[in-house]
Each structure stands twice: as C-alpha cells, then as structure tokens.
A protein has these predicted regions:
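A short beta-loop-alpha structural element at the N-terminal edge
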Residues: 31-45
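Conserved GNAT-fold acetyl-CoA-binding loop/helix
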Residues: 45-71
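A short helix-loop-beta-strand connector motif used in the catalytic cores of GNAT acetyltransferases and
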Residues: 69-81, 98
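Conserved beta-hairpin
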Residues: 78-90
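A short, internal acetyl-CoA/4′-phosphopantetheine-binding micro-motif in the GNAT/acyltransferase core
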Residues: 98-109, 132-133
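Conserved acetyl-CoA-binding loop-helix of GNAT-fold acetyltransferases
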Residues: 110-123, 141, 145
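Conserved GNAT acetyl-CoA-binding A-motif
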Residues: 123-135
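Conserved acetyl-CoA-binding loop of GNAT-fold acetyltransferases
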Residues: 144-154
Length: 174
C-alpha cells in the first residue's frame, strides 16, 4: 500500500513537470482532461465568443446559426478542456490527426493556454493538420511558432474565405 502511494505521488510529480497539471500550496489547480457532458454549455460559449472575436471578417450570423449544431456535435468529438479552479478556460477539438480548432476564453487569451492544449495533443500524435483562415493572422503566427508549416491554400466554401492548410510532424518516431 505504501509503495502504491509513493508511486502515485511520483507519477503526479512527473505530470506536473510536463505541465499538464499544476500544484499550488499542495492543491491541484489546473489540468487538461477529456470533455464531459456537463462541460458542453461552458465549451460552446467559449466556441461562440472566440469565433466572433477571431473571425470578425465572417458575418456574426454564421457563427450564431451554427451554435446549436456545435453543441450537439461536441459530445461526439475528441475534445480536451483546460480547466483551472473548476472553470473551463479553453479547449481543443480533434478528428483523428486533424485539429478542428483551439479555443481559449477571451479574458485569458495570450496566457499560454492554447500552447498547453496544443502541446498536450502533440504528445499524443505523430502528426497534425489544421485549416486556418488567412485573415486570422494571430492564429497563423501562433501555429508557425509551434512548427506548423503552410502546405497549401484553399477556399472555405461555407464562408467564402481563403484558408491555409497547415501541417505539423513530430521529430520523434512513435
């Protein structure tokens, strides 16, 4: 029994060192975990607000009209949330090796949460792909900083906006 406790404490310390969770005064305060049904309202709210702000070049009605559909699809997707003090502050959605999107609450953007979510997924996948609107300059710079490379350009037929297809590959063979 004592060995189990020591082993579990050791594993938690390794996870903390990897930046997946943090300890403050002996308490776990933030973590990345799989989406739960009880998270849907918080996550869909972040999805809508982030899209409205980041994609100002797309009519608001486009995002608002897709809100309910996204709420229905979230439980069927591979989604990981970043939670701090029981509040979801961001999430990443995937379909196989394709990143559907990284979304961080407006008030906490540029605090490293998007990077933590992306690093978490990079540790699980050997390669990743995503599409990003060409007018979303901050997102493009973020992905390039994270070693994503523009592979091609295409038109998003739903919005009429040009987008880049970007790829990332791990340096390590899995």
């Amino acid at each position: 029994m004592k060995k189990d406790k020591i082993f579990n404490a050791f594993i938690i310390e390794i996870i903390i060192l990897c930046g997946i969770i943090k300890k403050v005064n002996g308490e776990l305060t933030d973590m990345i975990r799989k989406l739960q049904k009880t998270d849907i309202n918080q996550v869909s709210h972040i999805w809508l607000n982030t899209n409205l702000k980041a994609h100002f070049f797309i009519p608001e009605q486009y995002w608002i009209s897709n809100y309910e559909f996204v709420k229905e699809m979230l439980p069927q997707s591979e989604v990981y949330v970043y939670e701090n003090n029981n509040k979801i502050q961001g999430f990443i959605g995937l379909k196989d090796d394709y990143i559907e999107g990284i979304f961080v609450a407006d008030e906490i953007q540029s605090h490293g949460i998007g990077k933590k979510l992306l690093d978490y997924i990079k540790n699980k996948k050997a390669k990743l792909q995503l599409n990003v609107y060409q007018k979303n300059v901050w997102a493009i710079l973020f992905y390039q900083r994270e070693r994503f490379i523009i592979q091609s350009e295409q038109l998003d037929e739903l919005t009429g906006e040009k987008e880049y297809v970007m790829n990332w590959e791990s340096n390590f063979k899995r």
